[in-house]
Curated annotation (Swiss-Prot):
This is Enolase. The keyword Secreted applies. Catalyzes the reversible conversion of 2-phosphoglycerate (2-PG) into phosphoenolpyruvate (PEP). It is essential for the degradation of carbohydrates via glycolysis. One of its GO terms (cellular component) is cell surface. It catalyses: (2R)-2-phosphoglycerate = phosphoenolpyruvate + H2O. It comes from Neorickettsia sennetsu (strain ATCC VR-367 / Miyayama). The gene is eno.
């Protein structure tokens, strides 16, 4: 009953209006798992390769029909008769079929959609939520699931490559902490979100939104933005903190960081972060430095890791081998997890296990090109107490993730 009987792929569209791939896995008992590959705007140089058609005459070369064909002609025949419960075996086969370190032959977009669809089909066969399948992969067999609410990180002001404004830092987030439930966290976040919108209108700023649903006003500097965000948080500062995704590789060139009209060297950049941490209630900074500058990451980790979460995204790309190196060399103290960065459920689970064992905080994350797929909500719930970074409280493909956690909370509490 658990055997794979059919694998079907199709080209659909993501929240940025570009094609992506959706995969359906059907079992011999008629159960179906359906998953969609997300897509990033700012990508780590070592992350798994999204396979695009490259035909400029069609969809600016960003079609994914080659990835769809790879599912139908290469992956599907190899998976026929396999059990959807054999996640590790199937993911290993997908990696073997591709044969490259970055999944560039079949495409990480094809592979991740298949891998997630298998996990969802398994959940359907078992009659359990997807988060239970993820929990079983994360823990020893027989361990009971204990619900611990994720902590939302909501990207309320967009900058960098996610918005058409002057802000170098890509994401300014609010993070409700210390709440007893995810619902309480979201209610607190919603209050701040609407106060921020009111302040933007009051100051004559645009309330248009960026790729991830956050406001994208034309603010002039990091300090102006943090000041505005602090004003919106107001009396809630004990329970609502600020988190940043600098995505610093996007404003780094020739050894300098171009931010707020200045060119800073790495020491000045670290001092910049230290200063704003002292001034504002910042609890987390993601990708604060250039992704290939491991030595400077070590310096910043030693200097600031007792004050904030230093989150590795582009530097780690959810790759267990790279995360292992980071842990060994003292780089960062938190790991951002994006399933499509590494390409399979099994490798993602391994990365989370490594991070947790080393005492690193785990942040489950969306991408800028998202869809209605809810897998990351289930992964965040499975991790127990992890951060969930899924965008803002506008754009349905973002809010859907938070709403799914609210539904799951009702099931487990």
């Amino acid at each position: 009953m658990q055997q794979i009987q059919k694998v079907k792929a199709r080209e659909i569209f993501n929240s940025r209006g570009w094609p992506t791939i959706e995969v359906e896995v059907t079992t011999s008992c008629g159960r179906v798992g359906c998953a969609i590959a997300p897509s990033g705007a700012s990508k780590g140089v070592l992350e798994a390769c999204e396979l695009l058609d490259g035909d400029k005459a069609r969809l600016s070369g960003r079609g994914v029909l080659r990835a769809v064909e790879n599912v139908h002609t290469i992956i599907a025949p190899a998976l026929m008769g396999k059990s959807v419960a054999a996640q590790a075996e199937i993911d290993s086969l997908l990696i073997q079929l591709d044969g490259t370190t970055n999944k560039s032959v079949l495409g990480a977009n094809a592979i991740v959609a298949v891998s997630l669809a298998v996990a969802k089909a398994n959940a359907s066969v078992r009659g359990v939520p997807l988060c239970i399948v993820f929990h079983n992969l994360l823990t020893s067999e027989g361990d009971d699931f204990v619900y611990v609410p994720p902590v939302p990180m909501l990207n309320v002001i967009n900058g960098g490559v996610h918005a058409d404004n002057r802000l170098a830092i890509q994401e300014f987030m609010i993070c409700p902490v210390g709440r007893r439930s995810f619902r309480e966290s979201m209610e607190k976040a919603a209050d701040v979100f609407h106060r921020l919108k009111g302040l933007l209108k009051q100051y004559g700023k645009s309330t248009n939104v960026g790729d991830e649903g956050g406001f994208a006003p034309d603010l002039s500097s990091t300090e102006e933005t943090l000041g505005l965000l602090s004003e919106a948080i107001g009396d809630s500062k004990e329970s609502v903190k600020i988190a940043l995704d600098a995505a610093s590789s996007t404003f780094y060139k020739d050894g300098k960081y171009s931010i707020d009209g200045k060119l800073l060297n790495v020491n000045e950049m670290v001092d910049f972060y230290a200063a704003i941490i002292e001034k504002y209630d910042i609890v987390s900074i993601e990708d604060p430095l250039y992704e290939s500058d491991w030595e400077s990451w070590q310096v910043m980790t030693r200097k600031l890791s007792d004050k904030i979460h230093i989150v590795g995204d582009d530097i780690f790309v959810t790759n267990p081998k790279i995360i292992k190196k980071g842990i060994k060399t003292g780089v960062a103290n938190a790991v951002l997890v994006k399933i499509n960065q590494v390409g399979t459920v099994t490798e993602t689970i391994e990365s989370i296990k490594l991070a947790r064992k080393a005492g690193y905080k785990v942040v489950i994350s969306h991408r800028s090109g998202e869809t209605e797929d809810l897998s990351i909500a289930h992964l965040a719930v499975a991790c127990g107490g992890a951060f969930l970074k899924a965008g803002s409280l506008s754009r349905s493909e973002r809010v859907a993730k938070y709403n799914e956690v609210l539904r799951l909370e009702e099931v487990f509490v």
